[in-house]
Swiss-Prot record:
Function noted in UniProt: This recombinant protein induces severe neurotoxicity on zebrafish larvae (Danio rerio) at a concentration of 230 mg/ml, but does not show toxicity when injected in blowfly larvae (Sarcophaga falculata). All fish incubated with this protein died within 200 minutes of exposure. Has also been claimed to be implied in calcification, but this function seems improbable.
GO MF annotation list: toxin activity
Organism: Acropora millepora
Tagged with keyword Transmembrane helix: no
Annotated protein name in UniProt: Small cysteine-rich protein 2
Record localization: Secreted; Nematocyst
Source organism, top-level taxon: Eukaryota
Signal peptide: 1-21
Length: 79
């Protein structure tokens, strides 16, 4: 009888961990997707090397510099 209770408990833990694991994976995927996008991606702007000027037609927008993946980049925004 005791081994049946242990088995049921183990099966319950395995099922719960499977459900929780899938949920955490989806949450992590959403967070990763948001992190990958950044604040300086299209349609906002494009990241360029910090010592290069923004190309013609784009304006410097330092408020989005943190959205660039590399600290040596700055953001140039579309008008």
């Amino acid at each position: 009888m005791r081994s049946q209770h242990v088995l049921i408990l183990l099966l319950g833990l395995v099922c719960a961990s499977q459900v929780l694991g899938k949920h955490l994976t989806k949450v992590k995927a959403k967070a990763l997707h948001y992190d990958k996008r950044g604040d300086c991606d299209w349609p906002t702007g494009v990241c360029f090397y910090i010592h290069d000027p923004c190309p013609p037609g784009l304006r410097r927008c330092p408020q989005h510099d943190d959205g660039c993946y590399l600290p040596t980049n700055h953001c140039c925004c579309y008008p």
